[in-house]
Swiss-Prot record:
Stated name of the protein: 3-methyl-2-oxobutanoate hydroxymethyltransferase
GO biological process, any: pantothenate biosynthetic process
Keyword terms of this UniProt record: Cytoplasm, Magnesium, Metal-binding, Pantothenate biosynthesis, Transferase
Protein's gene: panB
Necessary cofactors: Mg(2+)
Location of this chain's protein in the cell: Cytoplasm
Length: 264
């Protein structure tokens, strides 16, 4: 349990010493539950899938991301809060800076995460030069799933692995404080992590990353239509809530609820 606000300096100091823990959240309620139990809370555009029922993340808007980030910031006072910049909000350096400043002015997010390839290096540089804390997201990038033809594992061979390493190093030199690595072969995840002085957080990128993150509804069994290989379920949350709602409905129908102690 964190007893004070997590910082970039503390996250960087954990590299090679203690694994970084991270989870997603999209509202104040879940943020309060997770706050201080993990180092990082990510307000991911994955909310369009796990929260909005869609099959991709591309529909997330700036307005939605700001709304959910504000909610999470109200609920979490100790964990480090990172917000995703949605698809289309950082196509050019000027657009990226305008939208990043909008995030910073309208939320209490500690940092922003961008899904980027090496072509977006100018975007990353502009944000870092303006004092905006940036995490670069490399490997499998859900915002580009249409371009890639689906969710495809990266870093499968030496060429892909080396390209990811070179991109990660370039982003480090541009000023990012960390790298999120998604959906890459474990060996590539390890090589990227070893090549960097800044921490890496993995999701489906192997145990050698400096930290791990999962989508909360995957980790706690609220989404069971599909389970990626990298997900471990820590409880069957869907079944727990199903039992609870059925018990509630049964009590209402049988007039077992409310009773005298629950009435004015």
């Amino acid at each position: 349990m964190l007893d004070k606000k997590m910082s970039i300096a503390t996250l960087k100091a954990k590299k090679g010493i203690e694994k970084i823990t991270a989870i997603t959240a999209y509202d104040a309620l879940m943020a309060r539950i997770f706050d201080g139990e993990v180092d990082v809370i990510l307000v991911g555009d994955s909310l369009k899938m796990s929260f909005g029922g869609e099959n991709e993340t591309l529909g997330a808007s700036m307005q939605e991301m700001i709304y959910h980030t504000k909610a999470v910031c109200k609920g979490a006072k100790h964990s480090f809060i990172i917000a995703d910049m949605p698809f289309g909000s950082y196509a050019t350096p000027n657009m990226a800076l305008k939208n990043a400043l909008r995030f910073y002015k309208n939320t209490a997010a500690d940092a922003l995460k961008l899904e980027v390839g090496i072509d977006k290096l100018p975007v990353v540089k502009v944000l870092c030069e303006e004092g905006i804390a940036v995490m670069a997201h490399i490997g499998l990038k859900p915002q580009f799933m249409r371009f890639d033809g689906g969710f495809k594992i990266k870093g499968k061979d030496e060429v892909e692995s080396q390209e990811l390493i070179e991109a990660a190093v370039a982003f480090q030199e541009a000023g990012v404080f960390g790298i999120l690595i998604e959906g890459v072969k474990s060996e590539s995840g390890a090589r990227i992590t070893q090549a960097l002085e800044i921490p890496t957080i993995g999701i489906g990128a192997g145990v050698e990353c400096d930290g791990q993150i999962l989508v909360w509804s995957d980790a706690f069994g609220f989404f069971d239509e599909f389970k990626p290989k990298f997900v471990r379920r820590y409880c069957d949350g869907k079944a727990i809530l199903k039992d609870a709602i059925r018990a509630y409905a049964k009590d209402v129908k049988s007039q077992a609820f409310p009773q005298a102690q629950e009435s004015y």
